[in-house]
Swiss-Prot record:
GO terms for molecular function: succinate dehydrogenase activity. GO terms for biological process: fumarate metabolic process. The gene is frdD. Part of an enzyme complex containing four subunits: a flavoprotein (FrdA), an iron-sulfur protein (FrdB), and two hydrophobic anchor proteins (FrdC and FrdD). This is Fumarate reductase subunit D. Signal peptide: none annotated.
Length: 114
């Protein structure tokens, strides 16, 4: 018999952040590595342009997206990876997603104060 009133799960918002983090990591972080790892050291990108971009509102948004979403993805993977390896942390979801939330708030304050 199918339960007519299924219990709601708290997973959809976490899966949203996880999916966004995986997408951001796959698409945009290689570009960041190219800019910071190759173009900047060889002088093909001016440091002052990067700093000016970082202080603009769109730059702050980019910094937020490139730091917050991959952290959610990573902590979600660690949480479920430990579960798959039968390492059950008491209140693991609370710990890992709590750390991700604390990190998110910390990054928000740091970027807003740029």
């Amino acid at each position: 018999m199918v339960d007519q009133n299924p219990k709601r799960s708290g997973e959809p918002p976490v899966w949203l952040m996880f999916g966004a983090g995986g997408t951001v990591s796959a698409i945009f972080l290689p570009v960041v590595i190219l800019i910071i790892g190759l173009l900047l050291p060889f002088g093909l990108v001016d440091v002052h342009n990067l700093i000016t971009f970082a202080y603009s509102w769109i730059g702050k948004l980019v910094i937020l997206v490139l730091t917050i979403f991959p952290m959610w993805c990573g902590l979600h993977r660690i949480h479920h990876g430990m579960h798959d390896l039968k390492v059950h942390v008491p209140a693991g979801g609370f710990i890992f997603y709590g750390l991700a939330t604390i990190y998110t708030v910390w990054v928000l304050f740091a970027v807003i104060n740029l």
